[in-house]
Amino acid sequence: MLDDSKKRNSKPIPIVFSSTCATYGLPLENEIPISEMTPQNPINPYGRSKLMIEKILIDYHKAYQLPVSILRYFNAAGGDIKGDIGEDHNPETHLIPLVLEALFKKDGFIKVNGIDYPTFDGTCIRDYVHVSDLAKAHVLALNKIINDRSLSIYNLGNGKGYSIMEVIDTAKKVTGKEIKILQSQRRQGDPPVLISLPEKAKKELFWKPEFPDLESIIRTAWNWYLFKEQHKSNNKTNGL
């Protein structure tokens, strides 16, 4: 694709790449919050594959002036504000939809992997960013490199960290429901803390997240979950 873009056009086609904070691997405590200059040492195939593509894009920019914007997501979450679109993985692996699914079910439970991390409550801390805010960042990043033909790299997060227990407690508050918690062993390779430093994106792209806190993100995810379950119920009623 990259070769074709430079062959067929007088100007290479701008590329906005969805990368990940997983390229940073296990940052040191003094590297939190994570800036774009934090060393990249991915510890899993997902992070390594994203870093490989980043390096290829950077090489193409240097060799062919390919306009590139690399966006390193932190934990994408939430649903469309209207409730029409949201996370629906099979199998589900993301924390917020797993918690909401457990809350929706009678006698549901959520497994917490690790309660002995060096954090204030012993569980992992993550930086959650709303999917709509990520989409807006893509548009802003594309417009920038169309105009200046540059190479740009940005961390996309809210710059706030929430523990697994805080996610569960916030989801309980939003839904008004209770949930059973099962404590389990750590998962290998889970960093204790991942929090972004998003100031570069805010300064250069004029990016301003509309969902800056966990509760607002979970409310949109819960609206989506209710919409999805109602859709399933209607299909069963109609024999679909």
Spans of model-derived segments:
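Active-site proximal helix/loop that lines the substrate pocket
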Residues: 20-26, 78-81, 117, 161
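A short helix->loop->beta-strand "cap" motif at the edges of active sites that frequently abuts
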Residues: 2-14
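Catalytic helix-loop patch of NAD(P)-dependent Rossmann-fold dehydrogenases
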Residues: 11-14, 23-70, 75, 82-94
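Structural signature of the Rossmann-like NAD(P)-dependent dehydrogenase/reductase core
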Residues: 14-19, 69-72, 127, 155-156
